[in-house]
């Protein structure tokens, strides 16, 4: 991967700048129109990676209006951030990653009414690794289960854009800026800047997300797959459902037939015996 061409200066040097979000307009004025989308960018910091049991310790959401043709940011419509006291000790290793200590969250509580107001206004919710953030939000806020979630890791083809990693920090550096990562609002602002970055002359990444939010996704379940095929399934990007004991992956409609043939040849001994089912737009990343 090379940095975007605008960064390269004489003597093969790269110029990076620190981004703190101040260049994003903080207008609380609705400039949306029939040709724009209201998008909620969301980020969480948590006590750990266990989606079913760990707790949120910081949340940031920002509602923005985006032009559906250009991907330009029309306005910041609303925003909210807060710590949340998990009422349990934050592990020191977690604090080393996000810088959040027990003292910082002590006594704080998220105003879920404020979060709900923002999410309810949004046409779609974007998170970097949406499957992680959504799992927590679905536990805490019922309206999360009704919204369309889209993932800036999986729903932007970063590789075709010339980037060999989808990690947010790396993508931002390759676009010429760095930021105070692993703090919720800093991550949100940096993601907005990345998705609407002016270096994208043809199609900004945020437009990929808007487009993919309306494209149906299909789940292929390799039920009753032989145990000895687990490694080849894993190497072909299948995930293991530990509760129901089967391998699965999500695909677009144009990928289904070739995947069925692959499963027939490599897993089922010549005949496809899996299950294909359409995922509703609001169930994506559940």
Regions found by a protein language model. Name each.
Residues 131-133, 155, 225:
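Short, solvent-exposed loop/turn segments at secondary-structure junctions
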Residues 186-195:
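Acidic, divalent-metal-coordinating active-site segment for phosphoryl/phosphodiester hydrolysis
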Residues 1-30, 197-286:
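Acidic two-metal-ion nuclease catalytic site recognized across multiple nuclease folds
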Residues 2-148, 161, 165-181:
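Conserved non-catalytic scaffold segment of RNase H-like nuclease domains
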Residues 146-156:
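Short, acidic/small-residue loops that bind anionic groups at enzyme active sites
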Residues 140, 158, 174, 194-201:
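Active-site catalytic microenvironments for nucleophilic, acid-base chemistry
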């Amino acid at each position: 991967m090379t940095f975007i061409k605008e960064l390269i200066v004489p003597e093969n040097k790269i110029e990076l700048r620190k981004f703190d979000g101040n260049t994003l307009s903080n207008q609380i004025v609705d400039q949306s129109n029939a040709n724009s989308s209201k998008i909620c960018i969301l980020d969480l910091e948590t006590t750990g990676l266990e989606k079913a049991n760990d707790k949120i310790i910081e949340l940031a959401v920002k509602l923005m209006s985006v032009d559906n043709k250009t991907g330009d940011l029309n306005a910041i419509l609303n925003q909210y951030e807060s710590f949340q006291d998990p009422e349990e000790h934050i592990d020191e290793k977690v604090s080393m990653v996000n810088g959040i200590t027990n003292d910082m969250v002590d006594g704080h509580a998220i105003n879920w009414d404020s979060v709900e107001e923002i999410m309810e206004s949004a046409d779609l919710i974007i998170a970097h690794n949406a499957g992680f953030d959504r799992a927590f939000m679905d536990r805490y806020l019922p309206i999360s289960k009704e919204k369309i979630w889209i993932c800036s890791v999986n729903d932007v083809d970063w590789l075709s854009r010339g980037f060999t990693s989808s990690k947010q920090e790396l993508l931002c550096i390759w676009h010429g800026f760095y930021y105070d990562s692993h703090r919720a609002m800093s991550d949100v602002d940096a993601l907005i800047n990345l998705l609407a970055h002016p270096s994208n002359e043809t199609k900004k990444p945020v437009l990929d997300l808007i487009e993919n939010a309306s494209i149906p996704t299909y789940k292929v379940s390799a039920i009753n797959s032989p145990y000895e095929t687990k490694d080849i399934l894993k190497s072909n990007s299948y995930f293991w459902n530990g509760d129901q004991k089967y391998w699965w992956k999500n695909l677009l409609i144009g990928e289904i037939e070739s995947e069925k043939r692959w499963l027939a040849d490599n897993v089922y001994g010549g005949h496809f015996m899996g299950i294909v089912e359409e995922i509703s737009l609001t169930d994506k990343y559940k």
